[in-house]
Swiss-Prot record:
Binding site for Zn(2+) 4: C355, C360, H372, H376
The protein, known as: V(D)J recombination-activating protein 1
Listed result of changing C325G: Loss of E3 ligase activity and affects the joining step of V(D)J recombination
Source species of the chain: Mus musculus
Subcellular location: Nucleus
Length: 1040
């Protein structure tokens, strides 16, 4: 058996004794057990070591150099003698032996091109299914791409799928030539990328007439002939013919260059490289010259194969010769042409060239060459056009319009005749095209590109929507924007920004009242019109002479129209959310939209301007936020949108603005009652709205959670916050809450408050005032807005911080020892605390607690600073433990999703709240004996139940609306008008546009570029994003 096998097959090429599916395992096994007869002699090992050291260094990928055929044949025969059981086995199974021999021979061929590997000892191979080598990895790293294995690259370049290869049919390696093709494809070199085969090589399973095995057998049996003299003569003749053909091809190549030069025909408009002022090296000159006309590059463009040409030359050649690169014949189309990198253009424009004009020896940069030559032409023209005996002939541009018409009369007639004959009378198009060609001929391509953009209707300026985003986000009124527009246009001479009328057209699409919609069933007591924009706040209210007079200015959107506009503004986000959940775009719902409602009063919004009725110097704002959108899919609801920043002013959309006092119950009900009526009607109806070209159905869930305690009591008909019924969630009294600090549950609801109001109004049991008050648990007015029994996280922080501020003062005065302190002493404690906090914590004293002060006050550093003013160590420990417990509990009601953001604090909340209550009733008994604050009660008793019901407290807070209050002040100052009525319209419209997600995307794109370092001044920012608890300012907004 050993004699019958060809001796040219090496040990690694699987001879007879290793005709086994696990060939490599056999090799590894022999090395592992170090069979003595297989071990090489020391001389052989040394020779191999020397030869391997002498070989050139290859990449660190699995490159397999081929060894000469006869090197391991003796080794093979020895192995055959040592392992007779292998030979017996393969004698018995001849078919498997043939397949194994076929598989061994396959290893001598390239998988991609099918060529046989060279047997010179230096042939490099690469495993088809192996990792990418280091050189290729570094190349892709420069290209900012990531590739780890060969199959993806082979499929991308050669369109060959090697992932399904079988070792008995396909070769497992490819050659260095194919590797070079892949490397050149992705490198920036100018070398030609050429694959020698047009058809993919097909590999078939082994058959008796197999091409690979058949050619191998024939190759072994071929005899060598004696050299023939006549044959050598024929060979010489063939070589001569080959030389002659080579010379012809060279001549053809030269002649093709001449043809390309004739096609480009640019010798009169492009500069020769001989005009260069410096004698540069030949390679540099070649790099800055066009590869068609061999002139200096004029308006250079780069092809996808990284060759540089003049724009005119390459476009002419592509038109005449076809869509391929003249240098490397790689497919190339006019749309593939791109401008080279700026650094190359800077080098090109800085080259100094000699002026070819006579009597001018100036050397000018290529960038200023056109201007320099045009000065020569102008001076020449002024010398030519002189009337002898008359006054000098003036230049065309210096003439009056009448004189220009007179001089160009004949040309105008000719142009008009041409336009009527060829272009359907479009004189403007003919003149603009002539101007465009003149600019191109003088290499003034920047102006030509701008003109071409204007001719195509694109314009060189910004889109109206981008200009609107800039105006809204930079807080410019219409008049201020118009001044900026005129100034920029006058200075630059170009219309970069769009005029105001274009912005107003863009506004219409984004404001409520633009999109048609329908309700099924129709909304009760609400008009079916859809083109309703800003309306008066009192519209929809049936007024009579005997009613309470309403002295207010109020502007609002209709609630359903505003919701439609908000949904259409989020159209892209909704459709993208459906795609991300693998849902079809054509699904029409029903979608369920969860809306957070917020309302808040503002004090002191007085202005020193404006006419109209005398209205209160306070304001009330009602707004909403789309929190979540789900779609019914099968038996479950799939979430397609969730607001990532539910407490940002960027998503809190204004619905109603009024100049009124929130404590004025009559005015508040008069303005908000129509709005609430629309809301109640929408609860039992479905909206049909066309989105993405398909009518879709929406249902709405309204959750009134963005109210502070004062306003909750106002709209739910409860007594004021000083009442003995201290909680808006349960019926407990202040005394009961102080005795039982933790164990309470939510019992109040809007429906129950309405029933209790009827009992309060009618007194069916004829009880006394005290008995009746105890029966209705503090309900004293008719509830008119449904709110969700919850806690507002922001006001909870502010209320608790105010209480800690009071505790600090009492601890400084040691009230636990001396409870009966005078007012003067208490004021002195407060002054001492304010002075110390200002010195140590840089906290300036304020008249009223706000979110920013509360955040800074509630820290361990503040407690350490306060402890410096308290002599007792025992009180230090009590204060520190109280603050530590509070800081552990705070994240639970502040975070948007406590189960994800702070699961440990959520689990420990009940324990921490009980310990906190224990401290209040023991160490701080002097303050909390028989009483407790409203927010301490809510914090200790109701937080876990609300989290279990809603999943979050912080996400449903009123921070976005509070931040919107600051925006209201800013918009009002910005949109100052003589009429307060129009002023409120401007504020409402501007605030709505400020919350548009469509406009925010333009600003987010700018911010992304800015953070990447593309802007001029990356250090200059408008401020870090601040939450409402930080400063209640609007600086965390879109930035421009």
């Amino acid at each position: 058996m050993a004699a019958s096998l060809p001796s040219t097959l090496s040990f690694s090429s699987a001879p007879d004794e290793i005709q086994h599916p696990q060939i490599k395992f056999s090799e590894w096994k022999f090395k592992l057990f170090r069979v003595r007869s297989f071990e090489k002699a020391p001389e052989e090992a040394q020779k191999e070591k020397d030869s391997s050291e002498g070989k050139p260094y290859l990449e660190q990928s699995p490159v397999v150099p081929e060894k000469p055929g006869g090197q391991n044949s003796i080794l093979t025969q020895r192995a055959l003698k040592l392992h007779p059981k292998f030979s017996k086995k393969f004698h018995a199974d001849g078919k498997s032996s043939d397949k194994a021999v076929h598989q061994a021979r396959l290893r001598h061929f390239c998988r991609i091109c099918g060529n046989r590997f060279k047997s010179d000892g230096h042939s490099r191979r690469y495993p088809v299914h192996g990792p990418v080598d280091a050189k290729t990895q570094s190349l892709f790293r420069k290209k900012e791409k990531r590739v780890t294995s060969w199959p993806d690259l082979i499929a991308r370049i050669f369109r060959i799928d090697v992932k399904a290869d079988v070792d008995s049919i396909h070769p497992t390696e490819f050659c260095h030539d194919c590797w070079s093709i892949m490397h050149r494809k992705f490198s920036s070199s100018h070398s030609q990328v050429y694959f020698p085969r047009k058809v993919t090589v097909e590999w078939h399973p082994h058959t008796p007439s197999c091409d690979i095995c058949f050619t191998a057998h024939r190759g072994l049996k071929r005899k060598r002939h004696q050299p023939n003299v006549q044959l050598s003569k024929k060979l010489k003749t063939v070589l001569n013919h080959a030389r002659r053909d080579r010379r012809k091809r060279t001549q053809a190549r030269v002649s093709s260059k001449e043809v390309l030069k004739k096609i480009s025909n640019c010798s009169k408009i492009h500069l020769s490289t001989k005009l260069l002022a410096v004698d540069f090296p030949a390679h540099f000159v070649k790099s800055i010259s066009c590869q068609i006309c061999e002139h200096i590059l004029a308006d250079p463009v780069e092809t996808s194969c990284k060759h540089l040409f003049c724009r005119i030359c390459i476009l002419r050649c592509l038109k005449v010769m076809g869509s391929y690169c003249p240098s490397c014949r790689y497919p190339c189309f006019p749309t593939d042409l791109e401008s080279p990198v700026k650094s190359f253009l800077n080098i090109l424009n800085s080259l100094m060239v000699k002026c070819p004009a006579q009597d001018c020896n100036e050397e000018v940069s290529l960038e200023k060459y056109n201007h320099h030559v045009s000065s020569h032409k102008e001076s020449k023209e002024t010398l030519v056009h002189i009337n002898k005996g008359g006054r000098p002939r003036q230049h065309l541009l210096s003439l009056t319009r009448r004189a220009q018409k007179h001089r160009l009369r004949e040309l105008k007639i000719q142009v008009k005749e041409f336009a009527d004959k060829e272009e359907g009378g479009d004189v403007k198009a003919v003149c603009l095209t002539l101007f465009l060609l003149a600019l191109r001929a003088r290499n003034e391509h920047r102006q030509a590109d701008e003109l071409e953009a204007i001719m195509q209707g694109r314009g060189s300026g910004l889109q109206p929507a981008v200009c609107l985003a800039i105006r809204v986000n930079t807080f410019l009124s219409c008049s201020q924007y118009h001044k900026m527009y005129r100034t920029v246009k006058a200075i630059t001479g170009r219309q970069i920004f769009q005029p105001l009328h274009a912005l107003r057209n863009a506004e219409k699409v984004l404001l409520p009242g633009y999109h048609p919609f329908e309700w099924q069933p129709p909304l009760k007591n609400v008009s079916s019109r859809t083109d309703v924009g800003i309306i008066d706040g009192l519209s929809g209210l049936a007024s009579s002479v005997d009613e309470y007079p309403v002295d207010t200015i109020a502007k609002r959107f209709r609630y359903d129209s505003a919701l439609v506009s908000a949904l259409m503004d989020m159209e892209e986000d909704i459709l993208e959310g459906m795609r991300s959940q693998d849902l079809d775009d054509y699904l029409n719902g029903p979608f369920t939209v969860v809306v957070k409602e917020s309302c808040d009063g503002m004090g002191d919004v007085s202005e020193k301007h404006g006419s109209g009725p005398a209205v209160p110097e306070k304001a009330v704002r009602f707004s909403f936020t789309v929190m979540r959108i789900t779609i019914e899919h099968g038996s479950q609801n799939v979430k397609v949108f969730e607001e990532p920043k539910p407490n940002s002013e960027l998503c809190c959309k204004p619905l109603c603005l009024m100049l009124a006092d929130e404590s004025d119950h009559e005015t508040l009900t008069a303005i908000l009652s129509p709005l609430i009526a629309e809301r109640e009607a929408m609860k039992s109806s479905e909206l049909t709205l066309e989105m993405g070209g398909i009518p879709r159905t929406f249902k709405f869930i309204f959750r009134g959670t963005g109210y502070d305690e004062k306003l909750v009591r106002e709209v739910e008909g409860l007594e004021a916050s000083g009442s003995v019924y201290i909680c808006t969630l349960c019926d407990t009294t202040r005394l009961e809450a102080s005795q039982n600090l933790v164990f309470h549950s939510i019992t109040r609801s809007h429906a129950e408050n309405l029933q209790r109001y009827e009992v309060w109004r009618s007194n069916p049991y004829h009880e006394s005032v005290e008995e009746l008050r105890d029966r209705v648990k503090g309900v004293s007015a008719k509830p008119f807005i449904e709110t969700v029994p919850s806690i507002d996280a922001l006001h909870c922080d502010i209320g608790n911080a105010a209480e800690f501020y009071k505790i600090f003062q009492l601890e400084i005065g040691e009230v636990y020892k001396h409870p009966n302190a005078s007012k003067e002493e208490r004021k002195r404690w407060q002054a001492t605390l304010d002075k110390h906090l200002r010195k140590r914590m840089n906290l300036k004293p304020i008249m009223r607690m706000n979110g920013n002060f509360a955040r800074k006050l509630m820290t361990q550093e503040t407690v350490d600073a306060v402890c410096e003013l308290i002599p007792s160590e025992e009180r230090h420990e009590a204060l520190r433990e109280l603050m530590d417990l509070y800081l552990k509990m705070k994240p639970v009601w502040r975070s948007s999703c406590p189960a994800k953001e702070c699961p440990e604090s959520l689990c420990q909340y009940s324990f921490n709240s009980q310990r906190f209550a224990e401290l209040l009733s023991t160490k701080f008994k002097y303050r909390y004996e028989g009483k407790i604050t409203n927010y301490f009660h809510k914090t200790l008793a109701h937080v876990p139940e609300i989290i279990e019901r809603d999943g979050s407290i912080g996400a449903w807070a009123s921070e976005g609306n509070e931040s919107g209050n600051k925006l209201f002040r800013r918009f009002r100052k910005m949109n100052a008008r003589q009429s307060k009525c129009y002023e409120m319209e401007d504020v409402l419209k501007h605030h709505w546009l400020y919350t548009s997600k469509y406009l925010q995307k333009f600003m987010n794109a700018h911010n992304a570029l800015k953070s990447s370092g593309f802007t001029m001044n990356s250090k200059e920012t408008l401020g870090d994003p601040l939450g409402i608890e930080d400063s209640l300012e609007s600086q965390d907004s879109m930035e421009f």
